[in-house]
Amino acid sequence: MTRLCWTALLILGTARAEVPDFATAQRFLETHCLECHDADTQKGKFRMDELTERLETADAFKNWSRIVARLEAGEMPPPKRDRPPQADAESLLAWGKTALAAEAKTRQAGERTRMRRLNRLEYENTVQDLLQVDVALKEMLPVDDRMEGFDTAAEALSISPVHVERYMEAADAALQAAMMRGPQPEVITKRFFYDHQKESNFLNQGRQVGMMVRRDGEVQFHAETGVDHPAILQQLASFTREHPGRYRVRVAARTLDAKGEQITFSVSQSSKKQRAGFKVLGWFDAPSDTPAVFEIETTFLRDESITLRPYRLNDMRRQRGLSQYPPQDGSAPVGIALGILWVEVEGPLTEAWPPAGHRALFGDVPMVPFKSLPDHLVTPGLMQQWRKGGTLTPSSAQPEADAERLLRSFLPRAYRRPVSDDDLAPYLEIVHGRLKRSECFEAAMLAAYRAVLCSPEFLFLVEAPGPLDDHALASRLSYFLSRTAPDDTLRQCADRGELHQPDVLKRETERLLASPRSKAFVNDFLDQWLHLRDINATQPDKLVFPEFYIEEGGKNFKEDGLILQSFVEESRLFFTDLLQNDTSLLQLIDSDWTYVNQRLASFYQMPPVAGSSLRRVSLPPGSQRGGVITQGSVLKVTANGTRTSPVVRGVWVLENILGRRPLPPPPDAGSIDPDTRGSTTIREQLAKHQSNESCASCHRQIDPPGFALESFDPAGQWREFYRTRDGVDEIKARRPQPKASTKQTLKGRDVLGPATFLPGLPVDATGSMLTGEKFNGPQEFKKLLLREPHIITRCLAGKLVTFATGRAVDAGDLLSLDAIAADAATHHHGLRALMHAVIRSNLFRHK
């Protein structure tokens, strides 16, 4: 039996093992451990001869946690030592996990009662839903700290005077956005053409004139000019200046002289201050010759507009031997080009009037014009509206009675539970005090609403120790699966006291998972678990990895925005597919399918597909892709842009796939400096690094996963050789090199100019697992990983529990996590089944 199989059977057998007394556990340590970990030897600076059955101290809890983890991982006893009988090892693990769980339970009334604050995303979503507004609030708030990789951890979500100040500003912004200030705006459909005089002036001057041609009102782009189309920007911005709000945007576009190809273009939301666009609304594929109309919805603030930009058009023209400067004499276009006929906007779009947010705040209280605009409303937009015909404000004939009625309706939804008179009293006091000072009804009510949105009951998830009551359970479930407060259906279940019933909890879980709002869970969970939020944190060296960049004009290059977005969307669609179809979560490790578009398929060297939309495809035979570990998103966030590190990628796999956290490096460990000359591989450097005995034990775990992924470069591409810019002579001495040329083709793409790198030393993706099994490359490594389905399932369960509850799991939770993983295993490790197992567990339903 291999050591890996022994380890897997050991873990599965732990659940069946009878829990021994401490004397039995102690005999195991004396027989198999004390030779290396007694008072005299203390290998790894770890001593076991003083261990007792009492785990009250932090050191004792940590030491027993370490023993359980290392025995479970197969790290101990060391490979050269005889394995203890499996039954004995199972008994020790059973004792250790039981003792750790018992100690964790005794702590429950102490450190585990910390209240969790809403993080920035949850605050924004909750306020937007409560007031039915589409206003950005997250960026107004301080960045949340993370713990165990998640920004939902209660211990990391502190609050400071700065937070309070920013919450007040955010509350004011949201409340003003919810207010109805005038009659319902007329829904206008307006079409903007490129024959506007300002556009004509623009096209007759400036350095980009040679790359764009206007013919019969259609502008034709022959290059990625980076132009932000000032006429469209100015015309549309002047429109949104008068009427900010939700709009439907349509763009009519086509590909000219296509010859079977189509041009992809992006639509971004932009403003005068950010002319290059700050939010990509979508990517679209312009069909050949006959225009198509593309439609999106977005919310425009004042003066905002859109930017249209062709994608990789320079490459397409160059591959056809075409210049980016077409004739300017009005003759037919030469070569492939993007034609934009018009841009149309429809809006502002409102479902009802007064808006839902206004009704939530002021109900049916009559609206009357201000006689004079109060100071808190003196803004350019409202001043202009007031001068044109007045700005409306709620006016109550019975302000105190209306205030109580409105607050009684608003407060339970804000608090996410029923409220008492005592809950209501401080807000009524705010209103009464303002009214006594002769402030208007609106100002008094907005002051009370702002206080609600900054109150601890709103900002924190209030949960008493022990089993969660139905309203606390509703909040935990909703913030887990929808990333916002409970909706009416869920809140009504809690009001009736039904949610704790297993069948009702399962039904509501299914409803939320089937809702479009579950996309918020997928996006945020993967952003944190897989580190997708760091996708823009590094930039691959453009001279070494030119495939990752696109030409913007001349010698200017920029990161390929479509490939970055495609990386992230591939991971999200992959996870969503598993979740919605209850497919085995083990396909997160390896699969024979993924999601790609034309750009991603080319980047992965897969059979071509057409268009910018991602779709599910089967991987070709022999593909090195499959599962999340070999997706471009994960490979990019685990590299620094210049080089890869087996240590970084290895730690990522251990922590996020296997749930094993290596010990921090000792102070004398030193660091590994990159060899930019390429004359020494990272494996050779690590071999020297491991000569430090205190480093070697951890690197035996860390390095193998990292070595398996060395066949992928910092941009996420497959490679057989390292790329280098320097040290050519030293490399040649070890491996003959081809001569550098002035033009080379990299995976189908021409890179113009002098060669900026040479193939370096060959990549070695071989390695040995801690348990002795050998592998060559990522595919063999993934097959070895899949021999530990329980560990993989338990790790993901722990990540979900941490994300959902705001509390990091530890060794005291291993028994509960083992039970969750075993439950999912009876349902073929289905991802949806795992979600249900997590939600019905005590870890989720208890504080």
Q: What label would you give each PLM region?
A:
Residues 1-9:
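Sec-dependent signal peptide recognition
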Residues 15-19:
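Boundary at the C-terminal end of the N-terminal hydrophobic targeting segment
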Residues 20-41, 46, 59-66, 70-75, ...:
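Low-complexity, glycine/serine/threonine/alanine-rich intrinsically disordered linker
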